[in-house]
Amino acid sequence: MVEWTDAERTAILGLWGKLNIDEIGPQALSRCLIVYPWTQRYFATFGNLSSPAAIMGNPKVAAHGRTVMGGLERAIKNMDNIKNTYAALSVMHSEKLHVDPDNFKLLADCITVCAAMKFGQAGFNADIQEAWQKFLAVVVSALCRQYH
């Protein structure tokens, strides 16, 4: 089990409270699909992913980005039990969707980049980043649990 300091909880919950999941989710997933084009193979049913403009304008990408952020909200609400909270999601991504677990880290990094761009140094300083990335590392670990 992960131990969270009061400062980490405050930083994570404070950042989460400022994030607009309808904005950050689509941006982060779009960025992931553009920067790491091999991740597109998991989204064959999403239609046109042929260019950055097509990806950024794709409503299915945007909707799934919001879904991803909804999943993060579940982790936020269950910070002391993320692994169990994500158990079924880990099984689904491993056994049904066959997602390469390395891609979870790539998407987490894209979420971090989008948050940093949105809030800049004032709203996303090193202390906030440290706590946020610890949180996302726990989420990624929970998603990868079924793969071990």
From Swiss-Prot:
Keywords: Heme, Iron, Metal-binding, Oxygen transport, Transport. Heme b binds at H64, H93. Red blood cells. Pfam families: Globin. GO terms for biological process: cellular oxidant detoxification; hemopoiesis; hydrogen peroxide catabolic process; oxygen transport. PROSITE patterns: GLOBIN. GO terms for molecular function: heme binding; metal ion binding; oxygen binding; oxygen carrier activity. Residues 3-148 form the Globin domain. InterPro entries: Globin, Globin-like_sf, Globin/Proto, Hemoglobin_b, Hemoglobin_oxygen_transport. Coiled coil: none annotated. Belongs to the globin family. Involved in oxygen transport from gills to the various peripheral tissues. This is Hemoglobin subunit beta-2. The gene is ba2.
